[in-house]
């Protein structure tokens, strides 16, 4: 249906009333409309009011920006000169100049919401009848074409189907942030293309995000674009790496992120789609496509999505974001340059000392047992493993210090050629005691289900060897 020209079905002079049959206040004022000679526009059941204009397509109500019914509009010379909504005897008398109008009606009666403002409706009306105002180029899809296949054909997907980014869906996604659609967040590597909030929303739609995920996604993007995150290198490396998003704070619970059972796996919409949206933006805006500027030799599943929330349920545990300088109780994201998951199983350690030594044995294998101060890593402690530490009174600082001590080894065992293995540290480190990670290079996170003595290790990118140039990034989420 095409939107009628403003006022095309309406009188140049007189009154227009916008009603819903299901609204009791509309039924209350209906007898007055004949007295006023008003043109009646009905959003739901035109037959409920004699001579009413059928506006079930909501074109007239949208054009008049009706937010509540009944709305009474006074027109003169083809233009609106006044309006009121709901029923207020004083307001209706003031608008009409009829000082005895509605004398037998209650003084006040609240109206009802306009159908134009029902969930998901307004965005569709803007897309259909209005001007969305997007700067991105519109792509027309034929009536007989499959829009999902059209996205595949244009190379917009990560290999899985995406949600077609219609105008209504994009508008709805933009409702998830107060930031202007045209705001440029930064230049997305590797092509360094300008990334606007609008383009973020488009890719968030395709990834399957809900609007309330936008603050997390925008913060993750801002963290990834910090120079010290070296996103260009992470995208273009021959290594396995991709951005890993770790979310802390109230927003993770509010949007339903998973920090418990299967936290690093499938099945949670927020976890899956926030990480996927970032990777789609890298691909669709930045040009980071496999075989082009993405040169990963083997790749990794994190190139689809790798996003989870930290389990903050145990008050004995200091959340990662707080440990990295964010005020307690605030929401934040940490971006890490990570590979896949290396499983850690220890069913038998019962003391924090034993468990620390056991964890260190697995952490030594990150990247290569003889490469040190070369990778960062994330250690995801399951609640049962964390409880072994916490029940003994160990806090984050003590856990990290013990791991650091257990990860320090003689350089003679690590230099190239030692133990018949060519890989290793430079010969000049042979007389030193060498740490596996930089002091700030091991991020310890608590996540996972309540049952199971299983934790996980996520190896970092090889760029971590450049300590000052490539680091994880934590920023607060603007809510």
Regions found by a protein language model. Give the residues of each.
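N-terminal leader/targeting and pre-domain segments
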Residues: 1-13, 99, 103-112
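Catalytic cores of nucleotide-enabled group-transfer and carboxylate-activating enzymes in metabolic
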Residues: 4, 13, 36-37, 72, ...
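Short active-site neighborhood of thiol/selenol oxidoreductases, capturing the structured segment around
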Residues: 9-33, 39
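Structural motif
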Residues: 18-22, 42-46, 382-384
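Thiol-based oxidoreductase modules, predominantly thioredoxin-like and allied folds used
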Residues: 37-58
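Non-catalytic, surface beta->alpha helical segment in thiol-disulfide oxidoreductase systems
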Residues: 67-68, 73-111
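Long, low-complexity intrinsically disordered regions
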Residues: 104-129
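Non-transmembrane, aqueous-exposed alpha-helical and coiled segments at domain scale
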Residues: 126-479
